[in-house]
Regions:
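Extracytosolic ligand-binding ectodomains
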Residues: 128-405
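Gly/Gly-Pro-rich "capping" loops immediately C-terminal to redox-active cysteine motifs
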Residues: 40-93, 109-115
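Bacterial N-terminal signal peptides
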Residues: 6-16
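Extracytoplasmic
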Residues: 50, 66, 118, 140-142, ...
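Electrostatic cytochrome c docking/interface patches
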Residues: 18-48
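Positively charged n-region of N-terminal signal peptides that target proteins for export
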Residues: 1-4
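Detector for the c-type heme attachment site
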Residues: 32-35, 54-61, 96-100, 128-129
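C-terminal capping alpha-helices of c-type cytochrome domains
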Residues: 89, 93-100, 111-136
């Protein structure tokens, strides 16, 4: 999602009634490093590389590492022995010139940003709203999550049952856990919940742009997402490529064809270091990896006799497998295919409920979006084959390779 900060601020002036919301939206884009169009293009580049949240945390509470202080609204508006309270003008001076409200020089570790006064005012307004945004969906007696999975398959019911089985009831830290539907095509529908579960992977960036955590997307993530915003339990696309490249490097009988060529770049790059070569007229393919099942039949004609490597999604797309080939199925969703015989969607809901229960236990009573996301490495995930300390984004790098014939 692209935010035009100057445009939003101009609208704030023109439309008095919704000005506060628009200013906060502009400030959020700055805070998250997603304001791609600013008065000075250098600001957008600097924020993308060094967003405020990377040092001060998604909740603005600061961090011990680098001694980043809290910058949420209550902290800035409270006078300390070292300085008076910040207002928008003093905050603008701080982020542009590195000078505190009291006039002293701020740490050189803090980047200076070429913000205009309206941009700094928008960021200041967002920081004031940040504590409330961090606690969306949290009341003294209830915590509410959004669920974006298709409504017809009983996903929410299976999710709720799995969570309650792991918790031993419907409550954690004195709160009932509730799930409500959200529209994966409209990130605004997730603003009133703590986090959203079961989004299509392609919808995650829009929710992240709203500052809404995305838990357990329904498909593989690319692999470069921020674990402070997104957590899954399926291997990322980058992780699957790495695992497949390693397996081909050890098991391939000769050159490897990848089909279609338009999707081959990532895997070919992973193979380039020590993997088998691409085929040639002199040395034809002995293995073929098919990434798009709709092109399976055409792909096989280009590599007669080659052993086929194909993932579950490509098998689903193709609707069949050749009877005259060796086939290795690439299982990049091992958590969803198990001995229970569940459908993949039911298995996803069951695992989501179990993981969420343990993360909520670890996050504690003082629950915010940032604390929820930070609790993953500390959660006790016994029996779930996940480790968010070793694999912060996905909890796993496991990919299985299954000979089918």
């Amino acid at each position: 999602m692209r935010w035009t900060v100057s445009g939003l601020l101009a609208l704030c002036v023109a439309l008095a009634a919704p000005a506060g919301a628009q200013e906060i939206d502009a400030g959020r884009a700055l805070f998250l490093g997603r304001a791609t169009q600013t008065d000075d293009p250098a600001l957008a580049r600097r924020l993308a590389r060094l967003p405020c949240k990377s040092c001060h945390g998604g909740d603005g509470q600061g961090a011990d590492e680098g001694r980043a202080p809290p910058i949420d609204g209550p902290s800035l508006s409270r006078a300390t022995p070292d300085r008076p309270a910040y207002d928008a003008a003093l905050f603008h001076r701080a982020v542009t010139a590195g000078q505190s409200a009291g006039g002293r020089a701020l740490s050189q570790l803090m980047p200076r940003y070429p913000m205009t006064a309206p941009e700094a005012t928008a960021l200041f307004a967002y920081l004031a709203a940040l504590p409330a945004e961090q606690r969306q969906g949290v009341t003294p007696g209830r915590v509410t999550f959004g669920v974006a999975a298709p409504p017809g398959g009983g996903y929410r019911q299976t999710l709720q049952a799995a969570l309650e089985a792991r918790l031993g009831g419907a409550m954690v830290h004195g709160r009932t856990v509730a799930f409500v539907p959200v529209d994966p095509g409209n990130a605004a529908t997730g603003r009133q919940v703590l986090a959203v579960l079961a989004l299509p992977a392609g919808a995650v960036p829009d929710f992240a742009a709203e500052g809404i955590p995305a838990l357990f997307p329904l498909g593989p993530l690319p692999g470069d997402e921020d674990p402070g915003t997104v957590r899954g339990f399926l291997p990322s696309a980058a992780g699957t490529r790495a695992a497949l490249a390693a397996r081909l490097a050890s098991d391939a009988r000769g050159p490897v064809a990848i089909w279609p060529e338009s999707m081959a770049e990532g895997l070919r790059a992973a193979l380039s270091a020590n993997g088998p070569p691409a085929p040639s007229a002199k040395d034809p393919a002995r293995e073929i990896v098919v990434l798009d099942g709709t092109e399976l039949d055409g792909a096989l004609k280009t590599a007669p006799g080659a052993r086929l490597w194909i993932g579950w999604e490509a098998i689903r797309q193709a609707g069949h497998l050749p009877a005259d080939r060796e086939v290795i199925a690439i299982n990049d969703v091992p958590a969803l295919i198990g001995p229970r015989g569940d459908s993949p969607l039911a298995a996803h809901a069951r695992l989501s409920g179990a993981v969420l229960a343990e993360v909520l236990k670890a996050a504690g009573r003082d629950l915010t979006r940032a604390r929820l996301m930070a609790a993953f490495p500390a959660a006790w995930l016994d029996g779930l084959d996940l480790d968010y300390t070793a694999h912060p984004l996905t909890g796993t790098a496991r990919v299985d390779f299954l000979p089918l014939r």
